[in-house]
Amino acid sequence: MHSSRRTHLILLGAMLAGALPLRVLAQDAYPNRAIRVIVPQPPGGGFDFVARVLADKLGQVFKPGVVVENRTGSGTLVGTDLAAKAPADGYTLLMGSVSNLVLNAGLYKNLSYDPVKDFEPIGLAVSYSYTLVARKDLPFGNLAELVAYAKANPNKVSYASAGNGSGQHILAAALWHLAGVLLTHVPYRGAQPAYTDLIGGRVDVFFDLSPTARTHVDAGSLKALAVSGASRSPMHPSVPTLRETGVAPLELESWFGYFAPARTPAAELNRLRTELRKVITSPDVMDRLEKAGGKPLALVGDEAKAVLRRDLDRWVPLIKAAGIQPE
């Protein structure tokens, strides 16, 4: 009996010892299948553009490939929730932004995911400022003049957005709240129809991402009043920041980056962060991001988490104080 039991233990020990190299080998082989990046917006927008720029380059390192999967619905809620509930194995990532990880936290009382608890930042790749543009015949030379008129004439000035709860809506509503003025909100189904009416003179002002706004400003069809970043935009060097106008101590930049579901193993997180930093800082990727009007960031791990927490602390209370609603 003792001999049999001893033989059994020896065999079991040999089996376990033999399994260890296989486990190490499996870890070293990560990734051994394609990684998918969930984009919670349709193709063609900022989410999709940045996700594909990074995926194209990262896929050259991770030979099974990096595949972008657009999962839309309820703004950015459906795709983001899907990523939060995905297996935490390093094979599903989220294209995260201020929109789905910060602004949604202030907009929705019962958000189905927690931006901090449900995700681990891989890295932030780029940020874009917003530009406040006005119809070219609006009789104000700067933002301070517009605000002074709006104070004396409540709801006489109108502002467009790309929809209720969009980044354009929240930034504008927060600005008017801090400035103590009332403007009439005109929500559209996307930015393009907002531009059509703005250029046509049927609405007065509109906040949009600076790269898109620049096209219309450079064409002379609209004029720029302010940018939302911490510093002036290289695309509009003569246009002041919101802080510089003296109207409100407000700033917002829309950053984009990759996030993994919480509890993703440390080994996979470290590999992803190491390779993503190399991708973001590669000359060709930086060139593509800068030509699209972005400011490359290359903030990984705790650096990215600090930005997320900072913006949550800034914007969630402000959205609630301003009474901004998603509908």
Regions found by a protein language model. Give the residues of each.
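N-terminal export leaders
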Residues: 5-12
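Short coil/turn segments
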Residues: 42-44, 98-99, 127, 135-140, ...
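N-terminal (or domain-start) structured segment
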Residues: 26-117, 155-156, 164, 181-204, ...
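Hinge/capping helix and adjacent helix->loop/strand transition within the periplasmic-binding protein
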Residues: 85-91, 106-193, 242, 255-288
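Short beta-strand->loop
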Residues: 114-124, 160, 182-186, 204-205, ...
